[in-house]
Amino acid sequence: MTDRPVVPFLCVHNAGRSLAAKVLLDHYAAGAVDVRSAGSEPATSLNPAVVDVLTERGLDPTREFPKPLTDEVARAADVVVTMGCGDTCPEDPETRYVGWELTDPAGQPVEVVRGIVDEIDTRVRALLAELAGPAA
């Protein structure tokens, strides 16, 4: 484990769920976590509804872009969070994996995407609290 935990979020397209999780954890962790994201079949662009919802929250996802999933992403991680990539996500026996069952925001209206991002937000906050451990 490094000084900063490494947490990649993995999904199929790296345009919605994993993007939202990365942006949210980056925001809440304020540099205390090395946050990454990738997709097993990366999209060519970000999900516009997810971008809109994150922007509504005062976050800037515009520096992000869909990235391909590599074995190195998993090997460098302390905790890997998967979101629907199933068997296409690489697994390293030395790494802890957490699977988050979440609706894919692709093609969903912004009202539905808000609920998905709310759920991701709740899980990201819980993960950050777990990574921080008990207060000294």
Describe these PLM feature segments.
Residues 2-136:
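Short polar/charged helix/loop
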